[in-house]
């Protein structure tokens, strides 16, 4: 009997030490599924450190110059010409080829590369890396820059934020830009380019400085994720008191990092409150150019305001009746530098509409003026990231 009891005790001890559950409810192992990211967001798989950016789209011609050694090649990397200091030349599409100055290359795509780190100038703006000139079916030109992501991030940070702002604000902005860039690169991996000039403010090398390059290097390769998926880390100038849920503005699926937060830090911005008088005829002309038929506007109002009072839609009442359209679409048509945000109240005043609103930009993600205030108060860049993108995680991808 003693031997049997000893064996039973030994079996029980082995079971507990192995973590085996002995209750009837737990005798079947539970299969834990890997959390799935929201629809539309993508896992990080592409760790290549280059990105393609459309810097000129559908142009009749552009001006090209290279301040140093250069090569002109076709898509198969065959060198068609090389030399030193390519003088400023007009580039256009010409009879089934691409003409640079007085010479026509019978190809529909050319790659211009600086061989000694010189700048490639397009329309007098300096760029890095490699520039692709691409003929489109309508005989217009696309100009695409291919460069290192970190160089692109530096150029965007210097274009999006004043150079004299706080280091920690710049570092937070760099992480947001890199995350957005990697997301777009993954989402558009099969396209000719990953981003265009409407995605982010970008002025090539003109946005760079040694200080900004050093700050960007502090966060090199770091991006934000949620549930293991990279997401579009939107940012804007000033939210006016509360950032918006991404689903409210862009119809992307809502996730905690983009669900909106109270912002206590941009109230002193000159964009916290604003007022604009815009001619009704100007608004009507811009809407008609986008095939939105309106005449004699009587009233404009936002519908379905979000946490930050940014409207989801806009109702326009005119002589022809009532029309609705996306609030962000309306703002972009009128002019994003004229109509600062979609968080506004509009009043008809004779020939004008008076818009009174809060904030500058779409209101999603990082509030740049809020980030600057946080940095001045002593917050570090990870604090800023955690504040504006709650529950996000930092991952180094390269």
What are these regions (language model features)?
Residues 2-398:
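Conserved, single-site charged/polar hotspot
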């Amino acid at each position: 009997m003693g031997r049997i009891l000893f064996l039973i005790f030994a079996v029980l001890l082995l079971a507990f030490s192995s973590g085996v559950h002995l209750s009837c409810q737990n005798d079947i192992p539970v299969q834990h599924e890997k959390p799935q990211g929201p629809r539309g967001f993508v896992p990080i798989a592409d760790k290549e450190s280059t990105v393609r950016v459309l810097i000129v789209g559908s142009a009749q011609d552009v001006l090209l110059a290279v301040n140093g050694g250069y090569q002109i090649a076709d898509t198969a990397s065959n060198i068609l010409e090389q030399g030193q200091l390519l003088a400023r030349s007009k580039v256009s599409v010409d009879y089934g080829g691409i003409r640079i100055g007085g010479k026509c290359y019978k190809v529909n795509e050319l790659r211009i590369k600086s061989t000694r780190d010189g700048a490639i100038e397009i329309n007098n703006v300096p760029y890095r890396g490699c520039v692709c000139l691409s003929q489109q079916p309508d005989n217009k030109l696309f100009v695409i820059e291919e460069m290192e992501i970190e160089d692109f991030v530096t150029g965007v940070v210097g274009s999006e934020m004043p150079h004299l702002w706080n280091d920690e604000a710049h570092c937070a902005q760099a992480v947001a830009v890199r995350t957005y860039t990697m997301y777009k690169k993954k989402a558009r991996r099969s396209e000719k380019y990953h981003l265009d000039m409407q995605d982010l403010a970008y002025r090539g090398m003109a946005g760079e400085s040694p200080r900004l390059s050093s700050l960007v290097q502090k966060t090199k390769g770091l991006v934000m994720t949620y549930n293991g998926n990279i997401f579009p880390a939107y940012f804007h100038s000033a939210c006016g008191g509360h950032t918006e849920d991404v689903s409210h503005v862009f119809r992307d699926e809502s996730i905690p990092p983009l669900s909106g937060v109270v912002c206590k830090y941009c109230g002193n911005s000159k964009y916290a409150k604003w007022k604009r008088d815009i001619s009704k005829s100007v608004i009507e002309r811009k809407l008609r150019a986008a095939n939105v038929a309106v005449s004699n506007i009587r009233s404009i109002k936002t519908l379905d305001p979000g946490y930050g009072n940014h409207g989801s839609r806009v109702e326009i009442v005119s002589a022809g009746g009532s029309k609705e359209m996306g609030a962000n679409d309306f703002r972009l048509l009128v002019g994003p530098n004229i109509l600062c945000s979609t968080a506004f109240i509009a009043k008809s005043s004779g020939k004008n509409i008076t818009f009174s609103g809060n904030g500058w930009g779409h209101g999603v993600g990082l509030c740049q003026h809020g980030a600057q205030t946080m940095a001045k108060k002593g917050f570090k860049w990870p604090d800023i990231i955690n504040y504006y993108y709650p529950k996000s995680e930092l991952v180094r991808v390269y």
